[in-house]
């Protein structure tokens, strides 16, 4: 039996002290609704981390590649001896087979960790092999935390992944929708080609990619 490692959720009360240690209230600091606010503590954005030329080259290649829908276990059809999967209604996106270009994706993530994450979060022991997601019209990724999930019986989160930092690199130019929303932090990010977006993977940083209304978006994930 696997032991669950439970994590107490942050209070998310705007009238209580912020998690960042600034001494300010949460609602006046990392969850501020001000239009001139900075990104919350734990979010790092580097514009043009990847050149537009590299973005276009990877998108041209990805457009020709096969892709598979993200799946989830179908508990109604699965048996102890056979696991059956189905399309996940909350994750309407495809993982692209990058084949010979996978080494380029690995190098981008490695550089992000060495040049950016090491200064902001500390040195990484390892990184997950990155994969490329393709979102088309109607595509979305529902609310979730990357490394934790919620146990309603205990009113606590528990770890499901050995991930401390999430890394996204956006490649696409012509799309509408798909903004990245952090619910508890009241923070919205509009992706742009070449941008590196990093954030802490725990429950405070629960997020969702909203539905796309036009075009195709590619996002490199690790």
Regions found by a protein language model. Give the residues of each.
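Fe(II)/2-oxoglutarate oxygenase catalytic core
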Residues: 1-11, 32-198, 204-222
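Disulfide-bonded cysteines in secreted/extracellular proteins and peptides
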Residues: 18-20, 29-30, 55
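Cysteine-rich micro-motifs
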Residues: 25-33
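Short Cys/His-rich zinc-binding micro-motifs
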Residues: 8-24
């Amino acid at each position: 039996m696997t032991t669950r490692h439970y994590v107490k959720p942050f209070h998310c009360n705007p009238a209580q002290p912020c998690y960042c240690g600034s001494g300010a209230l949460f609602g006046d600091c990392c969850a501020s609704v001000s239009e001139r606010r900075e990104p919350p503590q734990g979010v790092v954005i580097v514009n043009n981390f990847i050149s537009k030329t590299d973005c276009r080259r990877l998108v041209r290649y990805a457009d020709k590649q096969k892709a598979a829908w993200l799946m989830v276990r179908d508990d109604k059809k699965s048996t102890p001896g056979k696991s059956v999967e189905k399309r996940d209604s909350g994750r309407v996106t495809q993982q692209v087979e990058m084949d010979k270009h996978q080494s380029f994706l690995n190098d981008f993530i490695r550089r992000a960790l060495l040049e950016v994450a090491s200064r902001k979060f500390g040195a990484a022991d390892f990184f997950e092999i990155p994969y490329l997601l393709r979102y088309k019209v109607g595509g979305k990724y529902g609310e979730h935390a990357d490394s934790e999930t919620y146990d309603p019986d205990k009113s606590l989160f528990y770890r499901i992944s050995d991930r401390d930092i999430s890394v996204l690199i956006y490649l696409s130019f012509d799309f509408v929708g798909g903004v990245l929303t952090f619910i508890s932090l009241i923070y919205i990010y509009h992706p742009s080609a070449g941008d590196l977006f990093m954030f802490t993977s725990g429950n405070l940083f629960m997020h969702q990619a909203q539905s796309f209304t036009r075009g195709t978006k590619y996002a490199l994930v690790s």
